[in-house]
């Protein structure tokens, strides 16, 4: 376990395309909060640094950037482009103590991969020093990175079911029925 055996502080990065869209806020915040929970269960102190929205909305961080065992470094580019996400990811991946990074949607994940094209630090073997990268979405660039081991894996949604629920909701609304939120599943995939 890279975190358990670390000689000093380690960094886990997260790149979000923005801090305003609710789906990205929830996805990014969910990653941060679950990571804090898991790290603290292993006895680690955690700080969240970077983008103000994500820092202020993180739940349970118990360390400062100066003294935490793990810093979750959250970056949001000035605009939503792969190139600017790549710049943010490069800044995180260039840290000697970066052990993992998450791109929270297709744009951010492709930005992480573009950053890696220059740095060549991502891989699936943390024990040998690879930075573990994961993404969100199933575009061809991300799927290829999962298949070749650059990304350990990624999470995707079910567009078919999202379309189905959209038609269901439209029909219900047209018939005057009250609508409720419909949760949709996410699915992890890797090279296996």
Placement of each model-derived feature along the sequence:
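A residue-level marker of the well-folded mature domains of exported/periplasmic proteins
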Residues: 1-192
């Amino acid at each position: 376990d890279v975190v358990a055996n670390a000689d000093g502080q380690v960094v886990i990065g997260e790149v979000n395309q923005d801090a305003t869209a609710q789906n990205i806020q929830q996805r990014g915040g969910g990653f941060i909060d679950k990571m804090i929970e898991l790290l603290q269960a292993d006895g680690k102190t955690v700080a969240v640094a970077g983008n103000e929205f994500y820092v202020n909305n993180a739940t349970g961080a118990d360390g400062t950037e100066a003294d935490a065992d793990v810093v979750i470094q959250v970056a949001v580019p000035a605009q939503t482009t792969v190139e600017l996400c790549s710049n943010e990811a490069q800044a995180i991946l260039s840290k000697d103590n970066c052990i993992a990074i998450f791109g929270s949607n297709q744009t951010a994940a492709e930005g992480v991969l573009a950053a890696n094209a220059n740095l060549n630090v991502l891989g699936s073997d943390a024990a040998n020093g690879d930075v573990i990268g994961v993404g969100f979405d199933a575009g061809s660039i991300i799927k290829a990175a999962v298949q070749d081991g650059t990304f350990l894996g990624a999470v995707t949604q079910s567009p078919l079911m999202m379309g189905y629920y959209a038609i269901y909701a439209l029909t219900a609304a047209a018939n005057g029925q009250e609508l409720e939120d419909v949760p949709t599943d996410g699915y992890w995939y890797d090279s296996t």
